[in-house]
């Protein structure tokens, strides 16, 4: 039976826990069902086609997942884009939220909370509405985008703006269920479905490399763990080289990788266009660095100027993505230099730019 356990001390957690009650470390899932290709429900064109590999009782769905995988060419090179910004609320967060909230609702949660700069909050509010739960989102008063706050409210979520929103949400978690996109292991489990879809869309094989923006690293780890499950099932030989790309404004993973550390250092945030990955201390930082080592991966940083140029190039290529989503493509010239022009590269386009365009 699948069980959440502490990543540090190994103690089991309760169903609604978001962190270890003993040592306050993050939680991992153990005894997950092995990946079974014969169990895929090929008539379900959502992430729930992998229901046999997702040990939660499905109660509701907004149809997230099964996003297109399409070729893109911009200055700097070619790649395959996984269009995660086409999920129901406009970001990859819907994968993790769908699995996490089905788990929490099945275990008695009624009031859920999270802290978010926008996308995770919109996703939580939408899926909570579908589940009949109430959702409250703590947003940073100084940086939250107005259009994203409007989206959270449109989905029925309540908003609390705070200058210390992390401290406030941790305090609120004493009485409400903390449905955290950073801490909850079921959120990361939901992200594995992106890897499984990519494998299917490529005809039952893995690409040579996968690049994502990295803040807390939920999608990055989901891709890594998803491909790891495929390797353990004997369906691929090698996990793709995982490429973590961060803004030069907040780049703890890049610094930890460059230093050969097991844990990213805490950094002082600097201004960045990539507001969705302004994370100075990733909850699963050690796991991200471990995944980089295991996959012979790369960790790269990009400047604001490159992010803006990449976003504009992607817009002209037909993909309206937000600045955070443009971070990996901003590193494309360097990625191609390191992995070669012929390597098959998948880049996740993580969030829609329509939300930010509406705010201009």
Predicted regions and their residues:
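PLP-dependent amino-acid enzyme catalytic core
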Residues: 1-360
């Amino acid at each position: 039976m699948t069980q959440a356990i502490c990543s540090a001390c190994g103690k089991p957690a309760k169903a609604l826990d978001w962190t270890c009650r003993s040592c306050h470390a993050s939680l991992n899932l153990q005894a997950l069902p092995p990946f079974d290709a014969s169990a895929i429900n090929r008539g379900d064109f959502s992430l729930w086609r992998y229901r046999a590999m997702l040990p939660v009782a499905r109660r509701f769905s907004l149809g997230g997942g099964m996003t297109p995988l399409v070729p893109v060419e911009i200055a700097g090179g070619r790649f395959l884009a996984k269009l995660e910004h086409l999920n129901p609320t406009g970001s990859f967060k819907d994968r993790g939220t769908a699995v996490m909230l089905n788990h929490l609702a099945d275990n008695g949660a009624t009031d859920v909370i999270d802290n978010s700069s926008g996308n995770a909050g919109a996703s939580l509010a939408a899926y909570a509405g579908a589940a009949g739960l109430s959702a409250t989102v703590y947003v940073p008063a100084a940086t939250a985008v107005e259009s994203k706050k409007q989206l959270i409210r449109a989905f029925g979520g309540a908003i609390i703006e705070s200058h210390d929103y992390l401290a406030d949400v941790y305090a609120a978690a004493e009485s409400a269920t903390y449905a955290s996109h950073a801490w909850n292991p079921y959120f990361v489990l939901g992200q594995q479905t992106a890897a499984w879809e990519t494998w299917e869309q490529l005809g039952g094989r893995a690409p040579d490399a996968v690049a994502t923006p990295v803040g807390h690293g939920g999608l990055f780890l989901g891709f890594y763990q998803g491909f790891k499950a495929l390797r353990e099932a004997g369906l691929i030989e090698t996990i793709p080289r995982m490429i973590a790309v961060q803004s030069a404004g907040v780049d703890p993973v890049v610094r930890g990788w460059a230093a050969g550390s097991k844990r990213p250092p805490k950094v002082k945030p600097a201004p960045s266009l990539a507001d969705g990955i302004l994370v100075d201390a990733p909850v699963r930082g050690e796991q991200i660095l471990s995944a980089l080592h295991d996959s012979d991966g790369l960790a790269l940083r990009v400047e604001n100027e490159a992010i803006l140029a990449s976003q504009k190039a992607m817009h002209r290529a037909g993909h309206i993505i937000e600045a955070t989503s443009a971070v990996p493509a901003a590193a494309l010239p360097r990625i191609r230099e390191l992995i070669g022009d012929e390597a098959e590269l998948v880049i996740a386009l993580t969030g829609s730019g329509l939300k930010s365009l509406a705010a201009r």
